[in-house]
């Protein structure tokens, strides 16, 4: 019998497992307090979608695996491949990304809705940072 009832639960389980893997690697490098480790996790792995959208806005349409490579080059984020695919799939289902077939390849590009959501998210982050500054 299948442990998961629907694809959303499978997605959550896969992301949870991969988040834990990524955090362990990052935590060993940083050696920070637990509070700071949680903050880093929340602002990177758990909000990976904003990084994916930024990469696609800067570099244009690309394959999911290339997104993974650019996440490392641009932000220094080592993200498991399955996590990138999961996030990209979720963003497509939400209309933030669009899947485009080019010959035998499938690339992803940001939709107009994706640009709007990215700008809203960035504005929210900037607002929070300005309120947190001393």
Where would I find each of the regions flagged by the language model?
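Short, Lys/Arg-enriched N-terminal segment that forms or immediately precedes the first helix
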Residues: 15, 21-42
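Beta-hairpin "wing" of winged helix-turn-helix
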Residues: 92-103, 109
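Short, hydrophobic-biased segments on the C-terminal half of alpha helices
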Residues: 85-90
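Amphipathic alpha-helical dimerization/coiled-coil segments
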Residues: 115-134
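DNA-recognition alpha helix
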Residues: 65-76
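Short, locally clustered residues in the helix-turn-helix/winged-helix DNA-binding domain
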Residues: 54-60, 72, 122
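Short capping segments at the starts of secondary-structure elements
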Residues: 45-47, 57-66
């Amino acid at each position: 019998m299948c442990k998961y009832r629907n694809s959303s639960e499978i997605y959550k389980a896969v992301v949870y497992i991969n988040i834990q893997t990524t955090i362990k690697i990052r935590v060993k490098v940083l050696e920070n307090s637990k509070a700071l480790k949680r903050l880093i996790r929340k602002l990177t792995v758990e909000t990976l979608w904003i990084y994916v959208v930024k990469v696609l806005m800067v570099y244009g349409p690309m394959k999911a695996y290339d997104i993974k490579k650019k996440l490392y080059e641009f932000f220094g984020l080592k993200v498991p491949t399955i996590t990138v695919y999961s996030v990209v799939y979720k963003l497509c289902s939400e209309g933030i990304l669009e899947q485009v077939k080019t010959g035998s390849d499938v690339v992803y590009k940001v939709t107009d809705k994706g640009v709007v959501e990215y700008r809203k998210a960035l504005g929210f982050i900037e607002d929070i940072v300005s309120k947190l500054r001393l």
